[in-house]
Amino acid sequence: NSIIIPQRLQFAGYTSSQALEVFGKISGMAMPLLFLPFTVTSALVVNIIPNISEQMAINNLRDVENKSSLAIKLTMLVAIPTSALFIIFSDHIATLVYNQKDVGNYLAIISYATIFLCLNHTLSGILHGMGKQIITTINFILGMGLQLYCTYFLIPNPKYGVNGFFIGYLIASILIFALNAITLRRHIKLKLKLMDNLIKPLFSTAIMILGMYVFYVGLSIVVKSNVINTIIATVVGTILYCLGLMITKTIDFKHTINSLKV
């Protein structure tokens, strides 16, 4: 990507300096923010892989199914609000972190892939614990091949431009997720509830976003600082999201912690 994207952008009409500037903002500014949720999914993966490997060795598929379902649920609880936050408050976040509002445009677009990226990370970890490294590698290569194809052929098209990369990135993330999910379902039965894994987190996220918006607008009347307003609104939003999860009984924190320890 570091070679192809700038070159293909020049075919779309960008100058060399413009192409490098756009690529730098995407890869050096927007992408690092996109990977922030991985700090949580990485902790899950590190915790789960050894446990799943042990349970697979003694053919305890029930525990593998329970651990995998819990890991996917926790991933969704992190990925959904993060994705919404990056999409809706992208300009404020980009201004807060980089003092460059235009980076927010790239962050907002690429953040549609957040949920799939996080799920891919978790699903790959589960499959690795089951000894399916070769399959996950093949799935990843197929996804990256599709991404490179879109990058190479869509970016030079003036109709798409740099959005060609985002399209390829999103489609590739969805493809890898689908392949990993299909692979996992062939080996274990996941116990996933639509209400707990999607509906309730979406409801809590809606409360979070609404609360953040109200607080940000209200604070902006008194405090003329994007930094302070964004930080306070984010803290308030996080609290509201956690309260939403507790009110809807989406997750039992004590049970979850104990399950991860076992």
Q: Predicted regions: what is each one?
A:
Residues 112-142, 153:
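Membrane-interface junctions at transmembrane-helix termini in multi-pass inner-membrane proteins
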Residues 135-161, 175-183, 204-216, 236-245:
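Alpha-helical transmembrane segments of multi-pass membrane transporters
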Residues 1-33, 54, 94-98, 249:
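Helix-terminus/linker motif at the lipid-water interface of multi-pass membrane proteins
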Residues 123-131, 181-197:
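Alpha-helical transmembrane segments
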